Swiss-Prot record:
Known role: Acts as a chaperone.
Compositionally biased spans, kind Low complexity: 580-591
Signal peptide: none
Molecular function GO labels: ATP binding; ATP-dependent protein folding chaperone; unfolded protein binding
Family: Belongs to the heat shock protein 70 family.
Species classification: Bacteria, Bacillati, Bacillota, Bacilli, Lactobacillales
Chaperone found in the keyword field: yes
Disordered as annotated region, ranges: 580-607
Location of Phosphothreonine modifications: T173
Listed SUPFAM superfamilies: Actin-like ATPase domain (SSF53067), Heat shock protein 70kD (HSP70), C-terminal subdomain (SSF100934), Heat shock protein 70kD (HSP70), peptide-binding domain (SSF100920)
Name of the protein in its database record: Chaperone protein DnaK
Length: 607
């Protein structure tokens, strides 16, 4: 069987690897580099890809960068006097990788495993497969990037059982996956992410800073100058990389533009502290997906054995420190963050060809899938973070007598009502025989394949008639919709938490009132008038707050009552102890005297 190459098709850089024996090997490009810039430029009818394209980006307006961010959209890019889809541009990058892989191997390559961010939607995954097809590659498998990284990290550790957290911050996307490794099984427990966060955003913060500073000094807005902007981008990327190793870097861009008095130059010192300040909000955004993934996996931080950093942006010191602070662990640096994803993809290729034995990769679907049922309810058939491939069936019935057809409304999301979730598609099962409501048996089956592609089938168990829909790429979720669903679900979870806290408070108030009234009654006539009066006053205050239904006041008055009731209970206990000691003779009498001292102290603290 011919080799299956592994490709990491990245936003900023791409890489290709192949399995040699039992080891995954990165293939260097014609310039000797182990990663290739994901840049395409057009010049005199020639297509230039990689390092050469990146070098001429400043002077060549027909240069395309970060095309991955447009995958799965209908947006096109203009270059070379034509319009290109993201799939076409991506295919050019894939063709280049394929070409130098063929030169290295000395044979034709027709099959590949390509990685995508874990949170890529159906449209983006389909677009990636289409790009592979355009490039002449049969895409054997789409693998999530953090999963591929885990595969490369754990291949030589199949005899160990570990739970690992993969923190993948690339050029344009961010993913967190939690996996359980053991006996050759790589089981993804949960995944979370942000498809609009990556190294490009860190670059943009520096660009915005440079533009603002230059405008302040010279009154000229460089953001409107395309050539100047490309120079700023190159300088920002270099400064970002420099600040991973030094605490200050000099940005020097001579002849950046011209003013009334002649040429103008951009000279600036950027410190790591300033860079950290500019990008603080971006670093903060990495924390929520980490917490979400841990919560979904049902794990605590103490149960994570290793934290693996993936993606070039994890070299940023502030990011590393945030990971340490969030996980409480020193990240494992045994893998190369730029190469590990492609290496994992090649290993998956080896699993497919049979060259890698006893390795099983179990990935997950990032959002729940289901249908709309009576009353507009979203009935889940497949839960978020379910291992794929998977299939799930459930039997439903009609909502009205003699109903001739049922509409199957396919949805994806986490909210309980259908209207709050994302519609993936609709189809109809017709020719249902006339029968009272609830009698017909309609079986709905969801299938998700190994690449995350969804298909839904509805079957009338009485007539055996069935109808199927495959969710097409144009019905995939956008990044914004995924973010909205997650935020909505989080907002609802927060509301549920508050409701529970309110119920718990009311129950606690009722219990405190009952217990205090009992104690006040038991201490009547026992000489604790001051303490009893204080407890009674606090009790009356709490009852008033309860009657007014003021939660914050109830909480405060409850704390006050607990303090006063405790003082009264102490007095009651001390009296009982003193009486018991009085019966023990002279030694007991001395002890009673001490107890009396305690009473004096108690009155002092109550003052």
């Amino acid at each position: 069987m011919s080799k299956i190459i592994g490709i990491d098709l990245g936003t900023t850089n791409s890489a290709v690897a192949v399995l040699e024996g039992t080891e995954s090997k990165i293939i260097a490009n014609p310039e000797g580099n182990r990663t290739t810039p994901s840049v395409v430029s057009f010049k005199n009818g020639e297509i230039i890809v990689g390092d050469a394209a990146k070098r001429q980006a400043v002077t060549n307006p027909d240069t395309v960068i970060s095309i991955k961010s447009k995958m799965g959209t209908s947006e096109k890019v203009s270059a070379n006097g034509k319009e290109y889809t993201p799939q076409e541009i991506s295919a050019m990058i894939l063709q280049y990788l394929k070409g130098y892989a063929e030169e290295y191997l000395g044979e034709k390559v027709t099959k590949a495993v390509i990685t995508v961010p874990a949170y890529f939607n159906d449209a983006q995954r389909q677009a990636t497969k289409d790009a592979g097809k355009i490039a002449g590659l049969e895409v054997e498998r789409i693998v999530n990037e953090p999963t591929a990284a885990a595969l490369a990290y754990g291949l030589d550790k199949t005899d160990k059982e570990e739970k690992i957290l993969v923190f993948d911050l690339g050029g344009g996307t961010f993913d967190v996956s939690i996996l359980e490794l053991g006996d050759g099984v790589f089981d993804v427990l949960a995944t979370a992410g942000d498809n609009k966060l990556g190294g490009d955003d860190f670059d943009q913060k520096i660009i915005d800073h440079m533009v603002a500073e230059f405008k302040k000094e010279n009154g000229i807005d460089l953001s409107t100058d395309k050539m100047a902007l490309q120079r700023l981008k190159d300088a920002a990327e270099k400064a970002k990389k420099d600040l991973s190793g030094v605490t200050s870097t000099q940005i020097s861009l001579p002849f950046i533009t011209a003013g009334a008095a002649g040429p103008l130059h951009l000279e600036m010192t950027l410190t790591r502290a300033k860079f950290d300040d500019l990008t603080r909000d971006l670093v903060e955004r990495t924390k929520t997906p980490v917490r979400q993934a841990l919560s979904d996996a049902g794990l605590s931080l103490s149960e994570i054995d290793e934290v693996i950093l993936v993606g070039g942006s994890t070299r940023i010191p502030a990011v590393v420190e945030a990971v340490k602070a969030e996980t409480g662990k020193e990240p494992n640096k045994s893998v190369n963050p730029d190469e590990v994803v492609a290496m994992g993809a090649a290993i998956q290729g080896g699993v497919i060809t049979g060259d890698v034995k006893d390795v099983v990769l179990l990935d997950v679907t990032p959002l729940s899938l289901g249908i709309e049922t009576m009353g507009g309810v979203f009935t889940k058939l497949i839960d978020r973070n379910t291992t794929i491939p998977t299939s799930k069936s459930q039997v439903f019935s009609t909502a009205a007598d003699n109903q001739p057809a049922v509409d199957i409304h396919v949805l994806q999301g986490e909210r309980p009502m259908a209207a709050d979730n994302k519609t993936l598609g609709r189809f109809q099962l017709t020719d249902i025989p006339a029968a009272p409501r609830g009698i017909p048996q309609i079986e709905v089956t969801f299938d998700i394949d190994k690449n995350g592609i969804v298909s839904v089938k509805a079957k009338d168990l009485g007539t055996q008639k069935e109808q199927t829909i495959v969710i097409q790429s144009n019905s995939g979720l956008t990044d914004e919709e995924i973010d909205r669903m997650m935020k909505d679900a989080e907002a609802n979870a927060e509301a549920d938490k508050k409701r529970k806290e309110e119920v718990d408070l009311r129950n606690e108030v009722d219990q405190a009132i009952f217990a205090t009234e009992k104690t006040i009654k038991e201490t009547e006539g026992k000489g604790f008038d001051a303490e009893r009066d204080a407890a009674q006053a606090a009790l009356d205050d709490l009852k008033k707050a309860q009657e007014d239904n003021k939660l914050d006041e109830m909480k405060a008055k409850l704390e006050a009552l607990n303090e006063k009731a405790q003082g009264l209970a102490v007095k009651l206990y001390e009296q009982a102890a003193a009486a018991q000691q009085a019966q023990a003779g002279a030694e007991g009498a001395q002890a009673t005297g001490n107890a009396g001292d305690d009473v004096v102290d108690g009155e002092f603290t109550e003052k």
